Swiss-Prot record:
GO terms for cellular component: cytoplasm. Belongs to the TNFAIP8 family. TNFAIP8L2 subfamily. Gene3D superfamilies: Tumor necrosis factor alpha-induced protein 8-like. The central region was initially thought to constitute a DED (death effector) domain. However, 3D-structure data reveal a previously uncharacterized fold that is different from the predicted fold of a DED (death effector) domain. It consists of a large, hydrophobic central cavity that is poised for cofactor binding. InterPro entries: TNFAIP8-like (IPR008477), TNFAIP8_sf (IPR038355). The lineage of its organism: Eukaryota, Metazoa, Chordata, Craniata, Vertebrata. Acts as a negative regulator of innate and adaptive immunity by maintaining immune homeostasis. Negative regulator of Toll-like receptor and T-cell receptor function. Prevents hyperresponsiveness of the immune system and maintains immune homeostasis. Inhibits jun/ap1 and NF-kappa-B activation. Promotes Fas-induced apoptosis. This is Tumor necrosis factor alpha-induced protein 8-like protein 2. Keywords: Immunity, Innate immunity. The gene is tnfaip8l2. GO terms for biological process: innate immune response; regulation of apoptotic process.
Length: 186
C-alpha cells in the first residue's frame, strides 16, 4: 500500500521552494535586520579572505538554505525527542561559540584558533546528527561547506588580527551577535 501524506508533501515542497529562494531579497524578508547585517559581514569576510566573490556568495547562500530548512523541519514538528535533545545541545554549543567569538574580539590577543575551530567543528557535527534523517546528502554537503569554510584556521587568524583588514568586519559581526544574545535570539 502506498503511503501518501499531503502534510509531508507540503513540507517537502516548502523546503524545496525555500532552498531556491535564498537570494538577498528573500533573506531580508525572512530574517531580521541584525541577522542580515551579520550575513553581509560574513559574505565580505569570505570574499576578502578567498578573493572569490562566487565562493563567498555560495557559502552564505548555503548557510541561509540550511537555516531555512532546519527552521521548516522544526516548525513542522519533524524532530523526535532525541533529536530535540540534540537541537538543545546544538543551541548550547552555538551559544558557547558566539560568546567565545565575542570574548576573543573584545579582549585583544586572547584569540585561540584551536578553540574556535573545535567549537565550529562540534556545532557542525551536532547539526549533521540532528538532520541526518531529514535532509539530503546535498544539504549535508552545504552544512560541511559552511562550517569548514568558517573554521578555516587561516581565515580565523586573519579575522582575529587586531588592526588587520578583517577586524572591522569582525567588530560588526560581534556587535550584531551581542545584540542577538541580548534579545534572547541566540
Amino acid at each position: 500500500m502506498e503511503s501518501f501524506s499531503s502534510k509531508d508533501m507540503a513540507m517537502k515542497a516548502q523546503k524545496k521552494i525555500l532552498s531556491h529562494m535564498a537570494s538577498k531579497s528573500m533573506v531580508q524578508m525572512l530574517i531580521d535586520d541584525t541577522s542580515s547585517e551579520i550575513l553581509d559581514e560574513l559574505y565580505r569576510i569570505s570574499k576578502e579572505h578567498s578573493g572569490n566573490r562566487t565562493e563567498a556568495q555560495k557559502v552564505v547562500k548555503d548557510l541561509v538554505k540550511v537555516v531555512v530548512k532546519v527552521g521548516v523541519l522544526f516548525r513542522h514538528n519533524r524532530f523526535s525527542k532525541e533529536e530535540l535533545s540534540l537541537a538543545q545541545d546544538f543551541k548550547k554549543k552555538l551559544h558557547q561559540g558566539v560568546m567565545t567569538a565575542i570574548s576573543f574580539q573584545e579582549v585583544e590577543f586572547t584569540f585561540d584558533k584551536a578553540v574556535m575551530t573545535e567549537l565550529l567543528t562540534d556545532c557542525r557535527d551536532i547539526l549533521l546528527k540532528l538532520v541526518e534523517k531529514h535532509l539530503t546528502l546535498k544539504s549535508f554537503g552545504r552544512i560541511r561547506h559552511v562550517f569548514n569554510h568558517y573554521s578555516d584556521p587561516d581565515l580565523l587568524t586573519n579575522l582575529y588580527t587586531p588592526g588587520g583588514p578583517l577586524w572591522p568586519n569582525l567588530t560588526k559581526i560581534c556587535n550584531g551577535l551581542n545584540k542577538l544574545v541580548e534579545e534572547g535570539k541566540l
